[in-house]
Amino acid sequence: MDIPKHSRRQFIQLASALGAGAMLPRLSEGAHHASISNPLAGRLYKTLKFKMIKIEGSLTDKFKAAKAAGFMGVEMNSPGMDIRETRKAMRESGLPVDGTVGSTHWKIRHTSPDKETRAEALKLLKQALRDTHAVGGHTCLLVVGKGEDGAADEIDKRSIENISQAVPLAAELGVAIVVENVWNQMHYDHDGDSNQTADQLAHYVDEFNSPWVGMQLDIGNHWKYGSMGDWIRTLGKRVIKLDVKGFSRALNDWAAIGEGDIDFADVRKALHEINYHGWVAAEVKGGDLDALKTISKQMDRAFGL
């Protein structure tokens, strides 16, 4: 009997969260009790973008700083990651790489009208998948393109056809391609109001018809355009991973995590409703060890960890 697609995607979500389990600390008894009052406690694993770790020293030193700040993983950039040095940093720090972020996807796009550019985008995506697998990661974050590359139906068709060619490799390696919702004028109205839904994103992901393509939903990026709790409910099991930052509709500007006016109470409720277990990645300015500790605590407060 075939396993439903969303069940397979949920398995990937859990594998992403627990695949580096040997390197993750055991939950304390306190965390167990905390989960009684807050169902997300013990179910979210904090990670951060590598570029946020702004301290001097080796890659190992940077990993150790992230761990000391309270993070349980690091997202590296790929292509461009030094596999050997990253493995060394993981080994010496005890901190896993849970996934990667595409380093070229804004410039070399799957939506490009130029066939050679799309071919290069595919080549780089496959390299990122291989790099991610080489360091034990389970997700490869992808910005699929830009709305400026053509009409909505054209760029959707181009990007889906192009990215789909990498899906067999993603399945072979056990690395999910996770689409991030960004301000790229795709699947939302950039000049629209705050009552927009995630329906277009859900449809886009479903067009791949694969559990190996899902969402890395950025909770801050589209608060300007819609209810993040409702977006989470709409996307459901398509959400393999989360990004987080703050945003203020009142000021129309970014904010620290938990500041601004994002309805985190509804976000927490929605994550519980879809039974989300997995990684949540900070995507903010970052800084030295003290700054990273502050960000980690902000995430704890926002998600009730």
Q: What spans do the regions from the language model cover?
A:
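Histidine-acidic metal/acid-base catalytic patches
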Residues: 2-47, 52, 56-70, 136-138, ...
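N-terminal substrate-binding region of glycoside hydrolase catalytic domains
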Residues: 65, 69-78, 104-105
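Metal-dependent catalytic neighborhoods of phosphoester/phosphodiester hydrolases
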Residues: 83-87, 152, 291-292
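Active-site-proximal loop/turn and secondary-structure-junction residues that shape catalytic pockets
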Residues: 52-54, 80-82, 103-106, 146-148, ...
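Anion (oxyanion) recognition and catalysis
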Residues: 67, 91, 133, 171, ...
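Glycine-rich, proline-tolerant flexible connector loops at the mouths of alpha/beta enzymes
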Residues: 77-92
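Active-site acidic/histidine proton-transfer and metal-coordination neighborhood
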Residues: 10, 14-24, 38-40, 111-217, ...
